[in-house]
């Protein structure tokens, strides 16, 4: 976990050297969890989009405890089946920073598949994400 996080932080520094635009981390599954954790370590991260994050790094790292200190805008989504789990994962964060999207049309899908053209109801995910980005401006 820590080696991968170092790579993410190095990528953030690289982007900062090339652009003055805000950094928004975007990750799915374990990378969603990693993005949430990395956002704590780097002040240049403006926000995080985490698709189906979870406790993929236990026992070494407990993401729910780690992200409770995160005070940056976060968009978290999942399938309907995963929603109670990701909701619990984000429960320790200050709610003013959290946009937790639960799909209403169909069962939803996991990770990046929820945004795929192959998923019938992808538009509700895209709409929720665009509203999140609008609020960042």
Predicted ranges, named:
Residues 1-18:
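Alpha/beta-hydrolase active-site loop
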Residues 86-101:
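Conserved loop-alpha-helix segment in the C-terminal half of the alpha/beta-hydrolase fold
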């Amino acid at each position: 976990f820590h080696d991968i996080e170092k790579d993410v932080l190095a990528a953030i520094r690289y982007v900062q050297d090339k652009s003055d635009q805000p950094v928004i981390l975007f990750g799915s599954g374990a990378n969603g969890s990693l993005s949430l954790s990395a956002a704590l370590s780097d002040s240049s991260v403006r926000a995080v989009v985490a698709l189906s994050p979870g406790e993929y790094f236990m026992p070494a790292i407990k993401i729910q405890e780690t992200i409770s200190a995160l005070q940056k805008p976060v968009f978290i989504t999942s399938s309907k089946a995963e929603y109670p789990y990701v909701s619990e994962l984000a429960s320790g964060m200050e709610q003013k920073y959290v946009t937790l999207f639960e799909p209403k049309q169909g069962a939803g899908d996991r990770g990046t598949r929820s945004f795929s053209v192959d998923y019938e109801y992808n538009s509700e995910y895209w709409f929720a994400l665009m509203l999140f980005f609008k609020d960042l401006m």
